[in-house]
Amino acid sequence: MRHKSGGRKLQRTSAHRTAMFRNMSASLIKHEQITTTVAKAKELRPYVEKLVTLAKRGGLANRRLAMSRLMDEAQLAKLFDVLAARYKDRNGGYTRIIKAGIRASDAAPIAIIEFVDRDMGAKGQDSGPVTTDEELEDA
């Protein structure tokens, strides 16, 4: 039987899809807005909304379940502390998808997926390692 085996494969193996959704959900939680293709955004939406629902319920078991899906401790802390508090009175619908035209290189439809009532300052936070002046002088 094929029950509950739907969803897009996105031309990837199951391990690649899992890793991609982990990375995309961590980026979405960190920046609260990301740009991707429409198909990936539509598949990412239920993945992230289930994580927010786990965070709203709280508790150690739900934190461990979310960690097994997210695999990023910093974003797990933000999910359970910031986002759970922000959406405590909202029953679902934590994200929105805005279609943003087509990509110039391959004409793929592009979309912006973002949290509703997002923090405008979160977008564009530094993602890479921080180098100090001392490290630059030593190099």
Curated annotation (Swiss-Prot):
One term of GO molecular function: structural constituent of ribosome
PROSITE patterns, alphabetized: RIBOSOMAL_L17
SUPFAM superfamilies listed in its UniProt record: Prokaryotic ribosomal protein L17
InterPro entries: Ribosomal_bL17, Ribosomal_bL17_CS, Ribosomal_bL17_sf
The UniProt record lists the keyword Lipid biosynthesis: no
Keyword vocabulary terms for this entry: Ribonucleoprotein, Ribosomal protein
Pfam families registered for this protein in UniProt: Ribosomal_L17
Highest taxon in the source lineage: Bacteria
Keyword Ribonucleoprotein recorded: yes
GO BP annotations, alphabetical order: translation
Gene Ontology CC terms: cytosolic large ribosomal subunit
Family: Belongs to the bacterial ribosomal protein bL17 family.
Subunit details: Part of the 50S ribosomal subunit. Contacts protein L32.
NCBIfam families: L17
The protein, known as: Large ribosomal subunit protein bL17
Organism of this sequence: Sphingopyxis alaskensis (strain DSM 13593 / LMG 18877 / RB2256)
